[in-house]
UniProtKB/Swiss-Prot annotation:
InterPro entries: UPF0145_dom_sf (IPR035439), UPF0145_YbjQ-like (IPR002765). Coiled coil: none annotated. It comes from Anoxybacillus flavithermus (strain DSM 21510 / WK1). This is UPF0145 protein Aflv_1588. Pfam families: YbjQ_1 (PF01906). Belongs to the UPF0145 family. Signal peptide: none annotated.
């Protein structure tokens, strides 16, 4: 499955647009992790804990989006956009959206 942020795929012709597809994931961060991450942020370093959480959320959201696209009969997702939102109580939401398409073989 081809997944791209562009609206077309070089060398490929879109046979059919199947519609909007998305994957949503909500992840929680625990209090100890938040505390340690805040110490890292205070001393000026990067928060590896949060970076890995972001990467995990992104990957899970994209995987869910791809699964839904396959179920629609797609062999590619174009125009992919990723969005991250922080929710209360240390929760984070990751959303991947795109257009499921069928490419000519």
């Amino acid at each position: 499955m081809i997944v791209t942020t562009t609206n077309s795929i070089e060398g490929k012709q879109i046979e059919q647009y199947l519609g909007l597809v998305s994957g949503e994931v909500i992840l929680g961060a625990n209090v100890v992790r938040d505390f340690l991450a805040s110490i890292t942020d205070i001393i000026g370093g990067r928060s590896g804990t949060y970076e890995s959480k972001l990467a995990e959320g992104r990957e899970m959201a994209v995987q869910e989006m791809v699964k839904k696209a396959r179920n629609m009969g797609a062999n590619a997702v174009i125009g992919v956009d990723l969005d991250f939102e922080t929710l209360r109580d240390g929760m984070m939401m990751c959303i991947a959206t795109g257009t499921a398409v069928k490419l000519k073989e």
